[in-house]
Curated annotation (Swiss-Prot):
One of its GO terms (cellular component) is chloroplast. Keywords: Chloroplast, DNA-directed RNA polymerase, Magnesium, Metal-binding, Nucleotidyltransferase, Plastid, Transcription, Transferase, Zinc. Its EC number is 2.7.7.6. Zn(2+) binds at residues 67, 69, 82, 85. PANTHER family: DNA-DIRECTED RNA POLYMERASE, DNA-DIRECTED RNA POLYMERASE SUBUNIT BETA. InterPro entries: DNA-dir_RpoC1_gamma (IPR012755), DNA-dir_RpoC_beta_prime (IPR045867), RNA_pol_asu (IPR000722), RNA_pol_N (IPR006592), RNA_pol_Rpb1_1 (IPR007080), RNA_pol_Rpb1_3 (IPR007066), RNA_pol_Rpb1_3_sf (IPR042102), RNA_pol_Rpb1_clamp_domain (IPR044893). GO terms for biological process: DNA-templated transcription. Belongs to the RNA polymerase beta' chain family. RpoC1 subfamily. Mg(2+) binds at residues 460, 462, 464. This is DNA-directed RNA polymerase subunit beta'. GO terms for molecular function: DNA binding; DNA-directed RNA polymerase activity; magnesium ion binding; zinc ion binding. The gene is rpoC1. It comes from Emiliania huxleyi (Coccolithophore).
Length: 609
């Protein structure tokens, strides 16, 4: 299909529209599309049965440019319709989009509009869902044409005994009353609904209705207005024609042992066709009304199971007592067609792994596992190997990569330098849910992430996963570097507040590094020539993280406060304070300064610098 489109819209389809989907006129003038047989493939020839669920005449040939009987083969016969089997010579890909249809012997309701919340049919007709189900599933009759003389009001429900009393009465006036049951009765009632008049009547009643009834009237008015605005006919919620999905979307595959694995939809379609054909035969031979009603109810239940298995109650199960997957099960949920295949497609140059903390990283860096990096950047590595003349073809380049030699890792490091990558954590609720980083090769299989960027992703390190994407074009790379780099996104787009803020372990760590430990104030006689000596002493366990020490820092501008006192000893001027000491020769301008601190505060200062 070469048609381009901007959006996908789901709405009601008319019976004529459903027929258009499945009905086609072949080049020889023959009209095909209706499925009349429940069979799938012939057990001897293993070819699709004609007019069955895999019919080649309706859906197209199984093999490219080859008819069912084998008379015509090859593309040179394109467009010809075989005289023997009636199959059009065409590409087999049409079996992915060509649909069929089933002409139902009796109308059935669409289970979504009966059992859905809210029930559209029940709201339009102004009845409860329970009353609607009584009619649809042949438990109660409904008056579709009132007779005031007999006290039969419009939409009045009648039991089996009431209907028999009227049916066996010979009075002509009683026969004038149309009393019906099943989906056909609902269709008649929907035909009689004047949407514009119903909407105006509800608007007149609303000011005088009590709260409970006003809410019910508002819900009904909302549904009626939706039908008026969309110009859909409410009777389209009653099915007379059932569309059949293309066969390649419900395949049947032969296994090694000769058995076949088939889609659950084929079993559900088979139930519908069997019951529909049986109902048609019973109507032809004018079977008793009780039998026909029972068959109509079974057809209704079969269509319900096909559309949404288990919606009404007990689900239809297969051979292993597993509920069969219906059309609704295929399209809904996380594994459904929309979220799995249309909205969340797998893309090339992407990967996924668990994230762990990487406090040693810079804010604009992330740790990319080597195993993932060599796979994602493989095309770039192959191009660089060929460009530099190290190999002559792609096969030789792949051989070098598979050997995990030092040359491959050296080229990979060169390729990754300056090439940003995108990290995304689902769900991406705002634009900071996907940001770019400069990749750093790390061992293991986990992605390492700087802890400060976690609030933007709403991520933590309890097993969260993130996706990696490689921007390919120069435009994408420049956009990733200029706009999406993590240090450039330090403000929340929602509130404008800083989002790169330390929390949890980082706050606790800063507090622990700078905390005062009174027990460490007893020994104040540790002096160090610079900060490096102090850190070296801490690493050698000579002092504790919270030990108070004096460190010489002549290059730091120390402001002496009022608490500092000066004394002179010989030609030395000594300055004493709570956290500051200095000494200066009276004959020289150089001053030796000391500051009281702890190894923890020195470490924090180095981190900030």
């Amino acid at each position: 299909m070469d048609r381009s489109f901007d959006y996908v819209k789901i709405n009601l389809a008319s019976p004529s529209r459903i027929r258009e989907w499945g009905e086609r006129k072949l080049p020889n003038g023959q009209v095909v599309g209706e499925i009349t047989k429940p069979e799938t493939i012939n057990y001897r020839t293993l070819k699709p049965e004609m007019n069955g669920l895999f019919c080649e005449r309706v859906f197209g040939p199984v093999n490219d440019w080859e008819c069912h009987c084998g008379k015509y083969k090859r593309i040179r016969h394109k467009g010809i319709v075989c005289e023997r089997c009636g199959v059009e010579i065409i590409d087999s890909k049409v079996r992915r989009h060509r649909m069929g249809f089933i002409e139902l012997a009796s109308s059935v309701t669409h289970v979504w509009y009966v059992k859905g919340r809210p029930s559209k049919i029940a709201l339009i007709l102004g009845m409860t869902v329970k009353e609607l189900e009584q009619i649809v599933y042949f438990n109660s009759y409904v008056v579709t044409k009132a007779n005031k003389d007999l006290n039969l009001s419009y939409q009045q429900l009648l039991s089996e005994a009431d209907w028999l009393a009227i049916d066996y009465n010979d009075d002509f006036s009683l026969k004038e009353n149309t009393i019906s049951i099943g989906a056909e009765a609902i269709k008649t009632l929907l035909k009689n609904v004047d949407l514009q008049q119903s909407a105006s009547e509800i608007r007149e009643l609303l000011p005088f209705a009590k709260r409970f009834f006003s809410e019910k009237l508002i819900r009904r008015l909302r549904v009626i207005n939706q039908f008026i605005a969309s110009k859909f006919d409410p009777t389209w919620m009653i099915l007379d024609i059932l569309p059949v999905l293309p066969p390649d979307l419900r395949p049947m595959v032969q296994l090694d042992g000769g058995r076949f694995a088939t889609s659950d939809l084929n079993d559900l379609y088979r139930r519908v066709i069997n019951r529909n054909n049986r109902l048609a035969r019973l109507q032809e031979i004018v079977a008793p009304e009780l039998i026909i009603r029972n068959e109509k109810r079974m057809l209704q239940e079969a269509v319900d199971a096909l559309i949404d298995n288990g919606k009404r109650g007990r689900a239809v199960v297969g051979l292993n007592n597993r509920p069969l997957k219906s059309l609704s099960d295929i399209i809904e949920g996380k594994q459904g067609r929309f979220r799995q295949n249309l909205l969340g497609k797998r893309v090339d140059y992407s990967g996924r792994s668990v994230i762990i903390v990487g406090p040693e990283l810079k804010l604009n860096q992330c740790g990319l596992p080597s195993e993932m990096a060599i796979e994602l950047f493989q095309p770039f590595v192959i191009h660089r190997l060929i460009y530099e003349g190290l190999v002559n073809n792609i096969k030789a380049a792949k051989s070098i990569i598979q050997k995990n030699g030092p040359l491959a890792w050296e080229i990979l490091a060169n390729v990754m330098e300056g090439h940003p990558i995108l990290l995304n954590r689902a769900p991406t609720l705002h634009r900071l849910g996907i940001q770019s980083f400069e990749p750093i090769l790390v061992s293991g299989r986990a992605i390492r992430l700087h802890p400060l960027v976690c609030p933007a992703f709403n991520a933590d390190f309890d097993g969260d996963q993130m996706a990696v994407h490689i921007p390919l074009s120069l435009e994408a790379q420049s956009e990733a570097r200029l706009l999406m780099l993590a240090p450039n996104n330090f403000l929340s787009p929602a509130t404008g507040d800083a989002i790169l803020t330390p929390s949890q372990d980082m706050v606790l760590g800063c507090f622990y590094l700078t905390a005062n430990n009174p027990s460490q104030q007893l020994n104040k006689n540790h002096y160090f020539s610079d900060f490096e000596d102090a850190i070296l002493a801490y690493q050698n366990s000579q002092i504790h993280l919270h030990t108070f020490i004096w460190v010489r820092c002549n290059n730091v501008d120390l402001t002496e406060d009022e608490t500092c006192s000066q004394t002179q000893s010989g030609n030395l001027i000594l300055t004493h304070g709570a956290d500051i000491k200095s000494k200066q020769s009276s004959s020289q301008d150089t001053k030796t300064k000391y500051i009281r601190t702890t190894p923890g505060r020195i470490l924090l200062n180095e981190i900030f610098q």
